[in-house]
Amino acid sequence: MTAREDRAGGEGFGRRVRLVPGGIEIAGDVVPLLAGSVHYWRLDPNEWRACLEAVKAMGLRLVDTYIPWAVHEVAPGKLELGASDPQRDITRFCRIAEELGLYVIARPGPHINAELTYFGLPERIVWDPACQARSPDQNPVMLPMLPFAFPVPSYASDAFHDEAARYFQALGPVLTPLLYPNGPIVLFQIDNEGALYFRDGAYDQDYHPDAIRLYREFLREKYGTIDALRASYGTPTPDEGEVPSSRRGEVTRFSAIDPPRKLDAERPRDLARHLDWSEFHEHLLATAFQRLGRALVAAGMDGLPTTHNLPPGQDATPLNAARVTKVVDLVGLDYYHMADPTSRAIIARRTSELATRSEALSVPAFACEMGAGFPPFFPPLDERDGAFTVLCALAYGLRGFNVYMAVERDRWIGAPIDRHGRARPYAVFWRKLSAALEQTGFHELRRKTPVRILIPRTERRLARVMHAFGPLSGAFFSIVGAGARERCVEDDLGLGYPLAIEADNFARAFEQALEARGVPFAVVGGEDRDIALGDARWLICATSGALKPELFDRLAEARARGARVTIGPHEPRFDGAFRPLSVPFDLGRLGEDGPLTGDVPAAADAAVSNAIGSLDLPAYACDPGGIYVTVHEDAAGAPRVLFVVNPSDRDIVARVSAGAVGTKASDLIDDSTFEARAGTLEVRMKPRTVRMLALR
């Protein structure tokens, strides 16, 4: 059950605000989720109105702001919220936004980052041993961050949650009167980029005593009995004489079980314990967000939808969107990318997964942070990078975004509005983009993806536990376009192939084959299996030889409905925890072809070529190669918007078959027009740019 379904079964949203596919419905009116970030506490209060007017002039409908705990706290449990310091008067800031017709997305943390020292947490919290995450050796877990490193909090720590709840209680009396319909706040974000503060290696953390207790409860709930757990792990019973006396408690009671501290698997079934630990991290984060959400409600901040933002590289972190969706209403992504071919592929992969999940849940695919500028310790991101990223994300299914940052502030370079509310040239692009989205009714359009590449959660957990670079986050490798092949150990555990690598290679081979022919597809996470497979004509499932029975059943059901199912590069001989199957899967339920193995790139190319004809798949091929096209349709199925993406450093003329997209197109940003000749639409493309074209 998702958070939205849970609300539907109870009192739901009590303030006439709810999420819908096109955005956020407020008192019956659908408002597209187009927002801009403004940090009031970093600006002169006398400039707030000018800054917010400039945000509205860019065509944005909401203002997004953090409410930093450390900035407002003057003593434990006591906040300064404008009584003596006008710069911290959140009420006045929100009321100005309301006067201007802007709604507010409030982000009270407790973790906010925002390039603040300690990520916006009070210094007393991060240096409190009871609040600190713990390493396997029970040391604080340090984050090497500018201006200096600090110990990160534990998402399991009761002391930390008690302190966060006290902060919310102090904040509640000021924020509650600002909630819609009495004020402009219509959306709350819970925490921020909750990837364990970027110390997200499988064996980095969290060995805090409260986390160990929660881990044992997680195992007890999952297995029910210690005998079931012992059977799963292949652990002998005490009377079999094979267990050292020092460890016999571990096989007789949950309360004595300790988590793994390093990867020590020697055979496939040894992985079960490690995969459980990786899954526990996902459970820990979802549980923490749920606790924080309940603390907000207890402080009077209730009746509104909630969000959480996943950081770049989220697929390599313990953030499991399918689980986070059970405790918050909208899971979005943060985008900070360069304009280049690698980023284009990453954006396509991330956004297609987000869009497919969001569509299935009837919520908008939302970028909680769409980078406009960069912090000074980041690789520079210029205006071309920002324009490329947002247009590319829209091309692959994004339906709303928050311009981060809309207004300049300290520790940020390149926002479209300066700190006095004066628009810079970059603001013109965002204003034109907002107008283009409104003109086309883009929030109501849909990009169809009849092909789904399914990545079982087992594969992502396996890549985490087999990560080869210690505390250097797997997310870093994902951000730069590297996969399991570049970051995982090549152990085969006796199976004769590198266990964590080949499924990733398989998925990427199909991505490349599909894109070469312009076939629209989406990536789907394995735990979205119950919501994101229904309308697919072709399911491609990557597996290293392990598959959950529940996932196999979903694939078989899809096959029974008429979809084609392709699995590979290995036959699934294990369940999702690499335990031998008691009864082998009946692969005949998936079709007659069997697993696709052998020369995967060649086989993928042949399979795609065959499927285009046999499954009547759309193909928006574009000449020359390396140029990508996506099409967005209205409710009647008519193509309305065409994106042409040139991630290369070449100035080229892209040629698109006009049969699928019409004979005339106009660029919604620079007003260029194009007309098909001899059945081909020719579009001039500058290097590393994206065109958004209205079709006629």
Where on the chain are the PLM-derived regions?
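N-terminal carbohydrate-binding accessory modules
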Residues: 1-62
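Conserved, mostly hydrophobic/aromatic
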Residues: 28, 55, 63, 97, ...
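The substrate-binding groove and active-site-proximal loops of carbohydrate-active enzymes
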Residues: 33-45, 69-88, 145-166, 218-220, ...
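Short, acidic/polar
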Residues: 42-57, 313-324, 384-392, 529
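Polysaccharide-binding and catalytic clefts of secreted carbohydrate-active enzymes
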Residues: 126-322
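Aromatic-lined substrate-binding rim segments of carbohydrate-active enzymes
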Residues: 48-129, 292-293, 297, 546
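Carbohydrate-binding surfaces of carbohydrate-active enzymes
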Residues: 254-261, 274, 288-290, 294, ...
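Hydrophobic faces of well-ordered beta-strands that scaffold small-molecule active sites
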Residues: 34-36, 63-65, 104-108, 186-190, ...
